[in-house]
Amino acid sequence: MLFRRFYDENLAQTSYMIACEKTHEAIVVDPNSDVAQYTRAAGADRVRIAHVTETHIHADFVSGAHALAKAAGAVLHFSGEGGSEWGYTAHALEGANVLRDGSRIDVGRIRVRAAHTPGHTPEHLTFFVSDLARGLDPVGALTGDFVFVGDVGRPDLLERAAGAKGSTESSARKLFRSLQEFGIEPDHLQIWPGHGAGSPCGKSLGSMPQSTLGYEKLFNWAFAKMSEEEFVAKVLEDQPVPPRYFAEMKRVNRLGAERPTTPEPTWLGLPELDSAIGSHATVIDTRPAHKFAAGHVPGTLNIPLGKSFLNWSGALVPETPDFYIITETASDDAMKNILGDLSKIGLTRVAGVFRSDVLREWKVRHGVLERVPQLDSTTLKEIAGRDGLQVVDVRSPEEVSGGHLPGAIHIPLAQLPDRIGEIDTSAPVVLHCRGGGRSSIATSFLQSHGVSDVSNLAGGFDAWVAHGFEVESAKPAKSVTGRKTVKSARGRKAAKSAGGRQSATAAGRRKPTISASGRRKK
Protein backbone atom coordinates (compact mmCIF):
# COMPACT_ATOMS: atom_id res chain seq x y z
CA MET A 1 0.00 0.00 0.00
CA LEU A 2 1.30 3.40 -0.99
CA PHE A 3 0.20 6.21 1.33
CA ARG A 4 0.56 9.93 0.71
CA ARG A 5 -0.57 12.79 2.96
CA PHE A 6 -1.11 16.31 1.59
CA TYR A 7 -1.23 19.03 4.22
CA ASP A 8 -2.18 22.63 3.46
CA GLU A 9 -0.80 24.77 6.29
CA ASN A 10 -2.90 27.78 5.32
CA LEU A 11 -6.11 25.77 5.64
CA ALA A 12 -4.84 23.35 8.32
CA GLN A 13 -6.41 20.77 6.02
CA THR A 14 -5.32 17.27 5.07
CA SER A 15 -6.12 15.14 2.05
CA TYR A 16 -4.83 11.68 1.21
CA MET A 17 -3.85 9.50 -1.72
CA ILE A 18 -3.75 5.74 -1.15
CA ALA A 19 -2.64 3.39 -3.92
CA CYS A 20 -2.22 -0.30 -4.59
CA GLU A 21 1.40 -0.91 -5.52
CA LYS A 22 0.46 -4.00 -7.51
CA THR A 23 -2.26 -2.57 -9.78
CA HIS A 24 -1.03 1.05 -9.61
CA GLU A 25 -4.54 2.33 -8.93
CA ALA A 26 -5.11 5.12 -6.43
CA ILE A 27 -7.90 6.84 -4.53
CA VAL A 28 -7.78 10.47 -3.36
CA VAL A 29 -9.85 11.45 -0.33
CA ASP A 30 -10.87 15.03 0.56
CA PRO A 31 -9.01 16.88 -2.21
CA ASN A 32 -9.00 20.67 -2.17
CA SER A 33 -9.17 22.78 -5.32
CA ASP A 34 -5.41 22.60 -5.99
CA VAL A 35 -5.92 19.45 -8.04
CA ALA A 36 -2.53 19.67 -9.75
CA GLN A 37 -0.76 18.54 -6.57
CA TYR A 38 -2.53 15.18 -6.72
CA THR A 39 -1.94 14.57 -10.42
CA ARG A 40 1.74 15.49 -9.98
CA ALA A 41 2.08 13.07 -7.07
CA ALA A 42 0.33 10.32 -9.02
CA GLY A 43 2.72 10.85 -11.90
CA ALA A 44 5.73 10.77 -9.61
CA ASP A 45 4.50 7.54 -8.00
CA ARG A 46 3.50 6.04 -11.36
CA VAL A 47 -0.06 5.38 -10.27
CA ARG A 48 -3.41 6.25 -11.83
CA ILE A 49 -6.04 8.12 -9.84
CA ALA A 50 -9.00 5.79 -10.37
CA HIS A 51 -11.28 7.00 -7.56
CA VAL A 52 -12.02 10.32 -5.85
CA THR A 53 -14.19 10.83 -2.79
CA GLU A 54 -14.65 12.98 0.29
CA THR A 55 -15.79 12.38 3.83
CA HIS A 56 -18.44 15.12 3.87
CA ILE A 57 -19.57 18.46 2.44
CA HIS A 58 -16.78 20.81 3.46
CA ALA A 59 -17.39 24.28 4.88
CA ASP A 60 -13.85 25.64 5.03
CA PHE A 61 -12.52 25.25 1.48
CA VAL A 62 -13.63 24.70 -2.10
CA SER A 63 -13.80 20.97 -2.76
CA GLY A 64 -11.62 19.64 -5.55
CA ALA A 65 -13.47 16.34 -5.88
CA HIS A 66 -15.39 17.13 -9.08
CA ALA A 67 -12.43 18.86 -10.72
CA LEU A 68 -9.95 16.09 -9.85
CA ALA A 69 -12.26 13.28 -10.99
CA LYS A 70 -12.74 15.08 -14.29
CA ALA A 71 -9.01 15.77 -14.75
CA ALA A 72 -7.99 12.20 -13.88
CA GLY A 73 -10.88 10.38 -15.53
CA ALA A 74 -11.68 8.85 -12.16
CA VAL A 75 -14.87 7.51 -10.63
CA LEU A 76 -16.41 10.05 -8.26
CA HIS A 77 -17.99 8.85 -5.01
CA PHE A 78 -20.20 10.92 -2.68
CA SER A 79 -22.15 10.16 0.48
CA GLY A 80 -25.84 9.45 0.05
CA GLU A 81 -26.47 9.43 3.79
CA GLY A 82 -28.03 12.10 5.97
CA GLY A 83 -31.16 12.90 3.97
CA SER A 84 -31.71 15.27 1.08
CA GLU A 85 -32.29 18.53 2.95
CA TRP A 86 -28.62 19.09 3.82
CA GLY A 87 -26.93 16.40 1.76
CA TYR A 88 -25.45 16.65 -1.72
CA THR A 89 -27.82 18.00 -4.36
CA ALA A 90 -28.93 15.95 -7.35
CA HIS A 91 -26.61 18.04 -9.50
CA ALA A 92 -23.61 17.15 -7.33
CA LEU A 93 -24.52 13.46 -7.39
CA GLU A 94 -25.02 13.33 -11.15
CA GLY A 95 -22.59 10.80 -12.58
CA ALA A 96 -21.24 9.92 -9.12
CA ASN A 97 -21.38 6.62 -7.27
CA VAL A 98 -23.54 7.09 -4.18
CA LEU A 99 -22.03 5.67 -0.99
CA ARG A 100 -24.03 4.27 1.91
CA ASP A 101 -23.07 2.88 5.28
CA GLY A 102 -21.11 -0.28 4.49
CA SER A 103 -20.34 0.60 0.86
CA ARG A 104 -16.97 -0.56 -0.44
CA ILE A 105 -14.50 0.87 -2.92
CA ASP A 106 -11.85 -1.60 -4.07
CA VAL A 107 -8.67 0.08 -5.27
CA GLY A 108 -6.66 -2.86 -6.53
CA ARG A 109 -5.91 -4.81 -3.36
CA ILE A 110 -6.80 -1.87 -1.12
CA ARG A 111 -10.33 -1.92 0.28
CA VAL A 112 -12.03 1.26 1.46
CA ARG A 113 -15.21 0.72 3.51
CA ALA A 114 -17.57 3.60 4.22
CA ALA A 115 -19.15 3.97 7.65
CA HIS A 116 -21.81 6.57 8.35
CA THR A 117 -20.57 8.73 11.25
CA PRO A 118 -23.01 11.65 11.54
CA GLY A 119 -22.58 14.48 14.01
CA HIS A 120 -20.26 17.01 12.44
CA THR A 121 -22.54 16.86 9.40
CA PRO A 122 -25.53 14.58 8.66
CA GLU A 123 -23.89 12.90 5.63
CA HIS A 124 -20.42 12.39 7.13
CA LEU A 125 -18.59 9.16 6.26
CA THR A 126 -15.48 7.64 7.80
CA PHE A 127 -13.42 5.42 5.51
CA PHE A 128 -11.84 2.26 6.95
CA VAL A 129 -8.83 1.20 4.88
CA SER A 130 -7.66 -2.43 4.60
CA ASP A 131 -4.59 -3.74 2.81
CA LEU A 132 -5.96 -7.05 1.50
CA ALA A 133 -2.44 -8.28 0.85
CA ARG A 134 -2.04 -8.40 4.63
CA GLY A 135 -5.56 -9.15 5.82
CA LEU A 136 -9.15 -8.00 6.02
CA ASP A 137 -8.81 -5.97 9.21
CA PRO A 138 -8.51 -2.21 8.65
CA VAL A 139 -5.10 -0.62 9.01
CA GLY A 140 -6.53 2.82 9.64
CA ALA A 141 -9.48 5.13 9.24
CA LEU A 142 -9.77 8.35 7.26
CA THR A 143 -11.90 10.21 9.77
CA GLY A 144 -12.35 13.55 8.00
CA ASP A 145 -13.96 15.97 10.46
CA PHE A 146 -15.30 13.22 12.73
CA VAL A 147 -12.28 12.46 14.93
CA PHE A 148 -9.20 14.67 15.15
CA VAL A 149 -6.06 14.27 17.21
CA GLY A 150 -7.22 15.44 20.64
CA ASP A 151 -10.66 16.60 19.55
CA VAL A 152 -13.76 15.85 17.47
CA GLY A 153 -15.58 17.74 14.74
CA ARG A 154 -17.88 20.46 15.97
CA PRO A 155 -21.61 19.69 15.59
CA ASP A 156 -22.78 23.32 15.47
CA LEU A 157 -21.58 24.32 11.99
CA LEU A 158 -24.71 23.14 10.20
CA GLU A 159 -26.73 25.66 12.19
CA ARG A 160 -24.17 28.45 12.58
CA ALA A 161 -22.74 28.35 9.05
CA ALA A 162 -25.46 26.78 6.91
CA GLY A 163 -28.54 28.09 8.71
CA ALA A 164 -30.11 24.77 9.74
CA LYS A 165 -31.99 26.17 12.72
CA GLY A 166 -32.32 23.89 15.72
CA SER A 167 -29.88 21.28 14.43
CA THR A 168 -27.01 21.82 16.86
CA GLU A 169 -28.18 19.74 19.81
CA SER A 170 -29.43 16.83 17.71
CA SER A 171 -26.14 16.84 15.78
CA ALA A 172 -24.21 16.74 19.06
CA ARG A 173 -26.23 13.71 20.17
CA LYS A 174 -25.58 11.96 16.86
CA LEU A 175 -21.88 12.70 17.26
CA PHE A 176 -21.92 11.10 20.72
CA ARG A 177 -23.50 7.92 19.34
CA SER A 178 -21.09 7.81 16.40
CA LEU A 179 -18.19 8.00 18.85
CA GLN A 180 -19.66 5.21 20.96
CA GLU A 181 -19.78 2.95 17.90
CA PHE A 182 -16.35 3.99 16.67
CA GLY A 183 -14.84 3.39 20.09
CA ILE A 184 -15.31 -0.38 19.88
CA GLU A 185 -12.80 -0.62 17.03
CA PRO A 186 -9.37 -2.06 17.96
CA ASP A 187 -6.92 0.27 19.67
CA HIS A 188 -4.25 -0.27 17.01
CA LEU A 189 -6.45 1.35 14.35
CA GLN A 190 -4.60 4.34 12.90
CA ILE A 191 -6.51 7.61 12.67
CA TRP A 192 -5.88 9.88 9.69
CA PRO A 193 -7.82 13.11 10.34
CA GLY A 194 -8.93 15.81 7.94
CA HIS A 195 -7.56 18.78 9.88
CA GLY A 196 -4.75 19.80 12.19
CA ALA A 197 -4.11 22.50 14.78
CA GLY A 198 -5.45 25.90 13.78
CA SER A 199 -8.55 24.70 11.99
CA PRO A 200 -11.84 26.30 13.09
CA CYS A 201 -13.60 22.95 12.49
CA GLY A 202 -12.91 22.06 16.14
CA LYS A 203 -11.77 23.82 19.29
CA SER A 204 -8.65 22.00 20.49
CA LEU A 205 -7.10 20.09 17.59
CA GLY A 206 -3.65 18.63 18.11
CA SER A 207 -0.72 19.22 15.80
CA MET A 208 0.29 15.57 15.38
CA PRO A 209 -0.44 14.43 11.81
CA GLN A 210 -2.01 11.13 12.86
CA SER A 211 -2.84 9.03 15.88
CA THR A 212 -4.33 5.69 16.92
CA LEU A 213 -7.70 4.97 18.42
CA GLY A 214 -6.02 3.63 21.54
CA TYR A 215 -4.10 6.88 22.02
CA GLU A 216 -7.23 8.94 21.50
CA LYS A 217 -9.11 6.86 24.07
CA LEU A 218 -6.43 7.82 26.57
CA PHE A 219 -5.98 11.51 25.74
CA ASN A 220 -8.92 12.78 23.67
CA TRP A 221 -11.54 14.38 25.93
CA ALA A 222 -14.37 13.09 23.72
CA PHE A 223 -13.57 9.46 24.57
CA ALA A 224 -13.65 10.04 28.33
CA LYS A 225 -16.40 8.30 30.25
CA MET A 226 -19.40 10.63 30.40
CA SER A 227 -23.12 10.68 29.81
CA GLU A 228 -24.69 11.88 26.60
CA GLU A 229 -25.90 15.02 28.36
CA GLU A 230 -22.41 15.76 29.65
CA PHE A 231 -20.93 15.23 26.20
CA VAL A 232 -23.45 17.54 24.52
CA ALA A 233 -22.70 20.31 27.00
CA LYS A 234 -18.95 19.90 26.66
CA VAL A 235 -18.75 19.63 22.87
CA LEU A 236 -20.82 22.79 22.42
CA GLU A 237 -18.91 24.79 25.02
CA ASP A 238 -16.52 27.51 23.76
CA GLN A 239 -16.56 26.54 20.10
CA PRO A 240 -14.73 29.14 17.98
CA VAL A 241 -16.73 31.52 15.84
CA PRO A 242 -16.93 30.18 12.27
CA PRO A 243 -15.67 32.58 9.59
CA ARG A 244 -18.33 34.18 7.40
CA TYR A 245 -17.16 32.40 4.26
CA PHE A 246 -18.12 28.99 5.67
CA ALA A 247 -21.75 29.51 4.62
CA GLU A 248 -20.77 30.11 1.00
CA MET A 249 -18.38 27.13 0.95
CA LYS A 250 -21.11 24.89 2.31
CA ARG A 251 -23.48 26.06 -0.41
CA VAL A 252 -20.93 25.73 -3.23
CA ASN A 253 -19.74 22.28 -2.21
CA ARG A 254 -23.24 20.95 -1.68
CA LEU A 255 -24.07 21.90 -5.27
CA GLY A 256 -20.92 20.26 -6.60
CA ALA A 257 -18.04 22.72 -6.74
CA GLU A 258 -16.17 23.29 -9.95
CA ARG A 259 -12.52 24.26 -9.83
CA PRO A 260 -12.28 28.02 -9.14
CA THR A 261 -10.41 30.14 -11.65
CA THR A 262 -7.27 31.66 -10.16
CA PRO A 263 -6.86 35.19 -11.54
CA GLU A 264 -3.57 36.34 -13.01
CA PRO A 265 -1.98 39.15 -10.98
CA THR A 266 -2.77 42.56 -12.46
CA TRP A 267 -0.21 45.04 -11.17
CA LEU A 268 -1.60 48.54 -10.60
CA GLY A 269 -0.23 51.93 -9.57
CA LEU A 270 -1.08 55.01 -7.54
CA PRO A 271 -3.97 56.27 -9.72
CA GLU A 272 -5.81 52.96 -9.31
CA LEU A 273 -5.11 52.96 -5.57
CA ASP A 274 -6.53 56.47 -5.27
CA SER A 275 -9.61 55.28 -7.11
CA ALA A 276 -10.00 52.15 -4.97
CA ILE A 277 -9.72 54.09 -1.71
CA GLY A 278 -12.02 56.81 -2.99
CA SER A 279 -14.70 54.26 -3.84
CA HIS A 280 -14.34 52.54 -0.45
CA ALA A 281 -13.24 49.25 -2.01
CA THR A 282 -11.64 46.63 0.21
CA VAL A 283 -7.85 46.89 -0.02
CA ILE A 284 -5.91 44.21 1.89
CA ASP A 285 -2.41 45.19 3.01
CA THR A 286 -0.59 41.88 3.50
CA ARG A 287 2.55 43.31 5.13
CA PRO A 288 3.53 42.30 8.69
CA ALA A 289 1.53 44.01 11.43
CA HIS A 290 4.43 46.12 12.71
CA LYS A 291 5.05 47.59 9.25
CA PHE A 292 1.36 48.33 8.78
CA ALA A 293 1.22 49.98 12.20
CA ALA A 294 4.18 52.21 11.35
CA GLY A 295 2.46 53.59 8.26
CA HIS A 296 -0.29 52.56 5.86
CA VAL A 297 -2.72 53.99 3.35
CA PRO A 298 -5.83 55.12 5.25
CA GLY A 299 -8.78 52.84 4.64
CA THR A 300 -6.76 49.66 4.05
CA LEU A 301 -7.22 46.43 5.97
CA ASN A 302 -4.19 44.62 7.38
CA ILE A 303 -4.22 40.81 7.09
CA PRO A 304 -0.57 39.70 7.19
CA LEU A 305 0.53 36.75 5.09
CA GLY A 306 0.96 33.62 7.20
CA LYS A 307 -0.87 30.55 8.42
CA SER A 308 -3.95 32.56 9.43
CA PHE A 309 -4.16 34.64 6.25
CA LEU A 310 -6.92 32.59 4.63
CA ASN A 311 -8.91 32.24 7.84
CA TRP A 312 -9.06 35.99 8.48
CA SER A 313 -9.49 36.85 4.81
CA GLY A 314 -12.51 34.57 4.71
CA ALA A 315 -13.87 36.13 7.88
CA LEU A 316 -13.35 39.80 7.03
CA VAL A 317 -13.35 40.22 3.24
CA PRO A 318 -16.77 40.49 1.54
CA GLU A 319 -17.48 37.71 -0.95
CA THR A 320 -18.96 39.62 -3.86
CA PRO A 321 -17.35 43.03 -4.50
CA ASP A 322 -13.94 43.20 -6.12
CA PHE A 323 -11.03 43.75 -3.76
CA TYR A 324 -7.37 44.71 -4.02
CA ILE A 325 -4.10 43.59 -2.44
CA ILE A 326 -0.98 45.47 -1.32
CA THR A 327 2.02 43.15 -1.12
CA GLU A 328 5.76 43.08 -0.57
CA THR A 329 5.87 40.15 -2.99
CA ALA A 330 7.79 41.11 -6.11
CA SER A 331 7.38 38.17 -8.49
CA ASP A 332 4.40 37.04 -10.53
CA ASP A 333 4.88 33.43 -9.43
CA ALA A 334 4.77 34.28 -5.72
CA MET A 335 1.71 36.44 -6.25
CA LYS A 336 0.01 33.65 -8.20
CA ASN A 337 0.49 31.39 -5.17
CA ILE A 338 -1.22 33.96 -2.95
CA LEU A 339 -4.11 34.33 -5.38
CA GLY A 340 -4.31 30.55 -5.68
CA ASP A 341 -4.61 30.24 -1.91
CA LEU A 342 -7.40 32.81 -1.83
CA SER A 343 -9.26 30.91 -4.55
CA LYS A 344 -9.30 27.85 -2.27
CA ILE A 345 -11.83 29.68 -0.09
CA GLY A 346 -13.72 31.21 -2.99
CA LEU A 347 -12.09 34.66 -2.97
CA THR A 348 -11.34 35.10 -6.65
CA ARG A 349 -12.53 38.66 -7.31
CA VAL A 350 -9.10 40.28 -7.04
CA ALA A 351 -9.29 43.41 -9.17
CA GLY A 352 -5.62 44.29 -8.88
CA VAL A 353 -2.40 44.15 -6.90
CA PHE A 354 -0.17 46.97 -5.65
CA ARG A 355 3.48 46.59 -4.74
CA SER A 356 4.28 48.08 -1.34
CA ASP A 357 6.39 50.78 -3.03
CA VAL A 358 3.10 52.54 -3.72
CA LEU A 359 3.04 53.65 -0.07
CA ARG A 360 5.92 56.05 -0.71
CA GLU A 361 4.11 57.48 -3.71
CA TRP A 362 0.95 57.85 -1.64
CA LYS A 363 2.82 59.78 1.05
CA VAL A 364 4.39 62.11 -1.51
CA ARG A 365 0.99 62.89 -3.04
CA HIS A 366 -1.14 63.00 0.11
CA GLY A 367 1.43 64.00 2.70
CA VAL A 368 0.51 61.46 5.35
CA LEU A 369 0.27 57.75 6.13
CA GLU A 370 -2.03 56.51 8.85
CA ARG A 371 -0.59 54.72 11.88
CA VAL A 372 -1.96 52.20 14.37
CA PRO A 373 -1.48 53.59 17.90
CA GLN A 374 0.07 51.03 20.24
CA LEU A 375 -0.95 51.19 23.88
CA ASP A 376 1.02 49.44 26.63
CA SER A 377 -0.63 47.71 29.57
CA THR A 378 0.56 50.25 32.13
CA THR A 379 -0.99 53.15 30.22
CA LEU A 380 -4.23 51.24 29.73
CA LYS A 381 -4.37 50.56 33.46
CA GLU A 382 -4.00 54.28 34.14
CA ILE A 383 -6.72 55.45 31.75
CA ALA A 384 -9.20 52.57 32.12
CA GLY A 385 -12.70 53.85 32.75
CA ARG A 386 -11.99 57.45 31.73
CA ASP A 387 -14.35 59.15 29.28
CA GLY A 388 -16.09 55.91 28.42
CA LEU A 389 -12.98 54.14 27.17
CA GLN A 390 -13.99 50.78 25.70
CA VAL A 391 -11.81 47.69 25.81
CA VAL A 392 -12.77 45.17 23.13
CA ASP A 393 -11.52 41.59 23.49
CA VAL A 394 -11.35 39.84 20.09
CA ARG A 395 -10.22 36.43 21.41
CA SER A 396 -12.19 33.21 21.09
CA PRO A 397 -14.89 32.25 23.61
CA GLU A 398 -12.61 29.50 24.96
CA GLU A 399 -9.84 32.00 25.68
CA VAL A 400 -12.20 34.49 27.28
CA SER A 401 -13.64 31.83 29.59
CA GLY A 402 -10.21 31.60 31.20
CA GLY A 403 -10.23 35.26 32.22
CA HIS A 404 -10.52 38.72 30.73
CA LEU A 405 -9.76 42.37 31.39
CA PRO A 406 -12.24 44.13 33.70
CA GLY A 407 -15.22 45.50 31.81
CA ALA A 408 -14.06 44.22 28.44
CA ILE A 409 -16.54 43.78 25.60
CA HIS A 410 -16.17 40.39 23.92
CA ILE A 411 -16.45 40.44 20.12
CA PRO A 412 -14.46 37.60 18.50
CA LEU A 413 -12.52 38.81 15.48
CA ALA A 414 -14.54 36.60 13.11
CA GLN A 415 -17.74 38.34 14.27
CA LEU A 416 -16.45 41.89 13.98
CA PRO A 417 -18.02 42.62 10.56
CA ASP A 418 -21.47 41.70 11.89
CA ARG A 419 -21.06 43.28 15.33
CA ILE A 420 -19.16 46.48 14.60
CA GLY A 421 -22.34 48.38 15.43
CA GLU A 422 -22.00 47.35 19.09
CA ILE A 423 -18.94 49.57 19.48
CA ASP A 424 -19.67 53.17 20.51
CA THR A 425 -17.25 55.26 18.47
CA SER A 426 -18.09 58.45 20.33
CA ALA A 427 -15.62 57.13 22.90
CA PRO A 428 -12.06 55.80 22.49
CA VAL A 429 -11.56 52.11 21.77
CA VAL A 430 -8.71 49.76 22.71
CA LEU A 431 -8.62 46.29 21.15
CA HIS A 432 -6.71 43.29 22.42
CA CYS A 433 -6.26 39.57 21.87
CA ARG A 434 -3.80 37.21 23.53
CA GLY A 435 -0.58 38.60 22.09
CA GLY A 436 -1.50 41.47 19.79
CA GLY A 437 -1.78 39.81 16.39
CA ARG A 438 -5.52 39.41 15.97
CA SER A 439 -6.21 42.76 17.63
CA SER A 440 -3.87 44.42 15.12
CA ILE A 441 -6.11 43.06 12.36
CA ALA A 442 -9.20 44.19 14.27
CA THR A 443 -7.78 47.68 14.78
CA SER A 444 -7.13 48.01 11.07
CA PHE A 445 -10.66 46.80 10.36
CA LEU A 446 -12.16 49.53 12.54
CA GLN A 447 -9.87 52.16 11.04
CA SER A 448 -10.87 51.08 7.53
CA HIS A 449 -14.50 51.59 8.52
CA GLY A 450 -13.97 55.16 9.68
CA VAL A 451 -13.29 54.63 13.39
CA SER A 452 -10.54 57.12 14.23
CA ASP A 453 -9.88 56.91 17.99
CA VAL A 454 -8.76 53.29 18.22
CA SER A 455 -5.59 51.67 19.60
CA ASN A 456 -4.06 48.21 19.83
CA LEU A 457 -2.96 46.82 23.20
CA ALA A 458 0.68 45.87 22.63
CA GLY A 459 1.38 42.37 23.93
CA GLY A 460 -2.32 41.78 24.50
CA PHE A 461 -3.80 39.82 27.39
CA ASP A 462 -0.50 38.06 28.07
CA ALA A 463 1.27 41.38 28.68
CA TRP A 464 -1.56 42.55 30.95
CA VAL A 465 -1.30 39.37 33.03
CA ALA A 466 2.51 39.59 33.10
CA HIS A 467 2.19 43.02 34.76
CA GLY A 468 0.06 41.45 37.49
CA PHE A 469 -3.00 43.54 36.67
CA GLU A 470 -6.53 42.48 37.60
CA VAL A 471 -8.26 39.76 35.59
CA GLU A 472 -11.96 38.94 35.87
CA SER A 473 -13.37 35.45 35.45
CA ALA A 474 -17.03 36.34 34.90
CA LYS A 475 -18.31 36.68 31.36
CA PRO A 476 -17.53 40.08 29.82
CA ALA A 477 -20.12 42.55 28.64
CA LYS A 478 -21.43 41.96 25.14
CA SER A 479 -21.53 45.64 24.20
CA VAL A 480 -21.64 49.10 25.66
CA THR A 481 -24.69 50.51 23.94
CA GLY A 482 -26.65 47.51 22.73
CA ARG A 483 -27.54 49.50 19.64
CA LYS A 484 -25.87 50.03 16.31
CA THR A 485 -23.67 53.10 16.39
CA VAL A 486 -21.43 52.50 13.38
CA LYS A 487 -22.30 51.91 9.78
CA SER A 488 -19.82 50.79 7.19
CA ALA A 489 -18.01 53.68 5.57
CA ARG A 490 -18.44 51.89 2.26
CA GLY A 491 -21.11 53.36 0.05
CA ARG A 492 -22.18 56.28 2.25
CA LYS A 493 -21.80 59.97 1.57
CA ALA A 494 -19.88 61.79 4.28
CA ALA A 495 -16.90 63.96 4.93
CA LYS A 496 -13.62 62.12 4.48
CA SER A 497 -10.43 62.05 6.45
CA ALA A 498 -7.13 63.01 4.81
CA GLY A 499 -6.78 59.45 3.57
CA GLY A 500 -10.10 59.47 1.75
CA ARG A 501 -12.09 57.59 4.46
CA GLN A 502 -14.73 59.00 6.68
CA SER A 503 -13.60 59.25 10.28
CA ALA A 504 -15.91 58.82 13.24
CA THR A 505 -15.45 62.48 14.13
CA ALA A 506 -16.12 63.68 10.58
CA ALA A 507 -19.44 61.88 10.68
CA GLY A 508 -20.58 64.24 13.41
CA ARG A 509 -19.83 62.09 16.45
CA ARG A 510 -18.64 63.66 19.69
CA LYS A 511 -14.89 64.07 19.86
CA PRO A 512 -13.61 62.26 22.98
CA THR A 513 -11.74 64.21 25.64
CA ILE A 514 -9.22 61.43 26.30
CA SER A 515 -7.80 59.47 23.39
CA ALA A 516 -7.17 55.74 23.51
CA SER A 517 -3.47 56.46 23.74
CA GLY A 518 -3.99 58.37 26.97
CA ARG A 519 -3.33 61.83 25.51
CA ARG A 520 -5.78 64.65 26.23
CA LYS A 521 -7.28 66.06 23.07
CA LYS A 522 -7.96 69.73 22.53
Regions found by a protein language model. Give the residues of each.
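Active-site metal-binding loops of divalent metal-dependent hydrolases
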Residues: P31-S33, I57, E81-G82, H120-T121, ...
